[in-house]
Every structure is written in C-alpha cells, then in structure tokens.
Amino acid sequence: MIQMQTNLEVADNSGARRVMCIKVLGGAGRRYASVGDVIVVSVKEAIPRGRVKKGDVLRAVVVRVNQGMKRKDGSLIRFDKNAAVIVNKQSEPVGTRIFGPVPRELRAKNHMKIISLAPEVL
C-alpha cells in the first residue's frame, strides 16, 4: 500500500530516480494506493539531462508494491521495493522503456502501454 510521504523507485527512463507520493488520486478521502492506481508524486532524485527534474510534480502509476497482493486463484505476489512509472495526464508513460517486471493486474486497470513496454509480466 502506498500512502502520502511514501518513497518509491522509478521503473522507467524518464530521468527520475526516486519520487515521493504526495496524493492518492481517486476519491476525496482515499488514503492508500495499490498496483495500477494513479498517484501524484514529487521528484526527489533525478539524473542529469533527463526529461524530468528534481522538484517536478507529476503523475505516476504504481507498478510494484512491497506488500503482498492476493490474486483470485489464492496466490500471493509481492515485490522487494515499491516502484512507479511516470505518466502524463492521458496516462501514457513519459519514458520509452520500463525496467523490471510488472504484474498483470495493470491490464485490468487499462495501462496497456506500460504492459507492452515491460520486459516481463507476472
């Protein structure tokens, strides 16, 4: 679960390396975000000459969460670190590559572009 002040790694080549969640979108009092949810983030660490700079406020889609997710078949999937992909207002990725695996739950949330760019879908 991702909430305000949670630090996440960035799983794309947009130029950001680390971001912090400042808002969970989707409802007035929504507190937590999980895989596939859109959040508002602030860039805390970025590489030089990237598309985004430190201090930028952007949207991101959560692609990996540390807490385990239960699937309908009863299996549990969890990742080592929390990670997100920077997206624009139309929910299209800013970067051109995705690093690391992404869960297939993104397909149900209509993030097909992220699924197609990912090297592995679990």
UniProtKB/Swiss-Prot annotation:
Q: Does this entry carry the keyword rRNA-binding? A: yes
Q: Return the SUPFAM superfamilies for the record.
A: Ribosomal protein L14 (SSF50193)
Q: Which family does it belong to?
A: Belongs to the universal ribosomal protein uL14 family.
Q: Which UniProt keywords apply?
A: Ribonucleoprotein, Ribosomal protein, RNA-binding, rRNA-binding
Which organism encodes this protein? Caulobacter sp. (strain K31)
User: What do the Gene Ontology cellular component annotations say?
Assistant: cytosolic large ribosomal subunit
Q: Which Gene3D superfamilies match?
A: Ribosomal protein L14
Q: How does it assemble?
A: Part of the 50S ribosomal subunit. Forms a cluster with proteins L3 and L19. In the 70S ribosome, L14 and L19 interact and together make contacts with the 16S rRNA in bridges B5 and B8.
Concerning HAMAP family, the annotation shows: Ribosomal_uL14
An example GO biological process term is:
translation
Keyword check for Ribonucleoprotein, yes or no. yes
Q: Which GO terms describe its molecular function?
A: large ribosomal subunit rRNA binding; structural constituent of ribosome
Name the InterPro entries on file: Ribosomal_uL14 (IPR000218), Ribosomal_uL14_bac-type (IPR005745), Ribosomal_uL14_CS (IPR019972), Ribosomal_uL14_sf (IPR036853)
What this protein is reported to do is described as: Binds to 23S rRNA. Forms part of two intersubunit bridges in the 70S ribosome.
Tell me the protein's name. Large ribosomal subunit protein uL14
